[in-house]
Amino acid sequence: MLMETLSRWIGGVNDVLWTYVLVAALLGCAVWFTLRTRGVQFRLLGEMMRVLGESAGSGPKGERHVSSFQAFAVSLASRLGTGKLAGVATAIVVGGPGAVFWMWVIALVGAASAFVESTLAQLYKRRGRDSFIGGPAYYMERGLGRRWMGVLFAVLISVTFGFAFNSVQSNTICAAWEGAFGADRVWAGVVLTALTLLIIFGGIRRIARVSGVIVPIMALGYIVLALGVVLFNLGRLPEVLELIVADAFGWEQTLGGAVGAALMQGIKRGLFSNEAGMGSAPNVAATAHVSHPVKQGLIQTLGVFTDTLVICTCTAFIILFGGVPDASLNGIQLTQAALESEIGPAGGVFVAVAIFLFAFSSIIGNYYYGEANIRFITPRPWALTLYRLLVGAMVLFGALATLDLAWSLADVTMALMTLCNLAAIVLLGRQAFLLLADYTAQKRQGIKNPVFTKDRIPELKDKAECW
């Protein structure tokens, strides 16, 4: 009885936060930042690709740092969870094909928020024991002078990503492998937990190396498969694109209220998927060794595009080419059924393997978000060790448990975390605009590789510890 009451209460809070408050706040900030940066996500798309190719730098002792690409891979690892396979399917079932169009829109506009938060994370980063550290908690303390706000954010993100989200990813992996291969959930959970602990106890550089290998392989593999499905159904591509656009704006949908459903589902799933403005990706953006803070802003903007415009679109095409979505199937089952209809029984096996790669990479990416914030709360080594062990325990717990209540609670903490971050980046946004102006000014002067030092912008001189 108590659990039912608690579940209903949490569900009510979620409805208010996600239907009204959070969607309005995220959209409003995304549009504002797009206007203030003059569409940085569109103007500097070519520069994003150039920066992504930069190699790791060397520090004063010659040690290797986290490169732009590795930071991109870790943040993309967290974004590329099972939501890419299940979340898009759910959006299509609930909101119709038109939800895909609104996911595209929110990615294009929301990318500006990702640029601002990651640029600020670079500006306010600090030197850690084995890498740079930073993120929203750090710019809340140093930029706004409000440590309490940083601690609140740090607690929320550590619980949300390290515990709740990782439990869900673990649960999805073990359920998929049990269904596809008959794997015992207990042993699957033990193996998954051991792999997780092995990697996270190696620190950010091991996490970056593993992500730098897994993410390109799984993303490219999934894209190649999706392209194969598209080529096989090339004659139907205009029909599917027309279906997406018509369902987003058609008269039938308008009269039936379906446009509103498509809009809400597309926005909610898009925001949840690409994390723009949530305050998660800046934690890893701060670790990169770059010559100018704007570079990581550009890299993380590209991450939003890769996540939604590429990976999520692949899933949408696979499902829509498979026919009318079956509302009786859940997200993962729908994607699996759609693939099986295209390539036969091998599709189910591919989904099981893809789920493992997507979800496992997400687990280690999510963990690092928590690590950066545990270090903000306290520098004591035992606290980080305890957190790592608790993350491992939650991965094992997730493999064996049902997680409906935990997932609903995570939605609440994630919403509060996001609102906290949005308030901070709106207040500090002008500093990101100044950095962008400095970067583009250097490019106009013919400088191929812009460099930032704190004396270039007097207003930021006391803010930049590492510049």
Regions found by a protein language model. Give the residues of each.
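Alpha-helical membrane segments and immediately flanking helix-loop junctions
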Residues: 59-93, 120-123, 129-137, 141, ...
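Membrane-interface loop-to-helix entry segments
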Residues: 25-32, 37-49, 171-177, 184-232, ...
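Flexible loop linkers connecting adjacent transmembrane helices
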Residues: 39-67, 90-92, 96-100, 104, ...
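Extracellular loop-to-transmembrane helix junctions
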Residues: 11-50, 93-130, 306-312, 412-422
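N-terminal alpha-helical transmembrane segments of multi-pass membrane transport
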Residues: 1-82, 93-98, 426-467
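Helix-loop-helix module between adjacent transmembrane segments
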Residues: 29-34, 106-130, 136-137, 141-171, ...
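Transmembrane helix-loop junctions in multi-pass membrane proteins
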Residues: 5-6, 36-41, 83-88, 97, ...
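Extracellular/periplasmic helix-exit of transmembrane alpha-helices
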Residues: 115-124, 129, 225-243, 257, ...
